[in-house]
């Protein structure tokens, strides 16, 4: 009986010990919380995980983050950092579990990022549209990885063969960018051109490819698909051959889609070397 009493007291003490930090957190100010969480991020991301090459030492990388999560599992950035390398090594289902946690704890910051990962990495185009649509409704047409949420919606429609929806989405996004920034991103013009090409609207497709080439003059994909549109319209063989050859040469020289994440994934309609 005495032993049971001692064990019971020890268990109660352990439970209470674990409760005190949570009570303290409930009383902390927003500023104190930020300071505490920033310290955890510094220790377990910048001073630990970031110093490890996850391509070789994934367990050690994840251990750094897990130690931080044990201190505070509500820090969304720790969950995002756990997810990110799994997407980059194409273990999308593993990464998704952690990225969902990041969205749960900070939807405004990570929902559009999840939509981006679904579109470019996991190829979950319907899921990408859902995430980006929800983000736009709640927070506006935010930029994620240099592009608007609408851009990824248009790209997802393109990959789902819903070309008319893709065309309209890119068109609206281009007009909004011109209104706000005086110009649109060359990839919006390029993919707008692709959506038109897929619908055999060849003259309009060429016009959009030309807009992309105005910004990025050696853009091999724009040249390549422009040559296809010209062939469909019956342009001269010499003109088509010149443009096609120039596109192939520029692709060999590396004048392709310039997105940072193109080192991990082939982008839609990107030419292979």
What are these regions (language model features)?
Residues 55, 89, 121-122, 160, ...:
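Structural motif corresponding to the intra-repeat A-B loop/turn of tetratricopeptide repeats
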Residues 61, 95, 128, 166, ...:
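Single-residue signature of alpha-solenoid repeat helices
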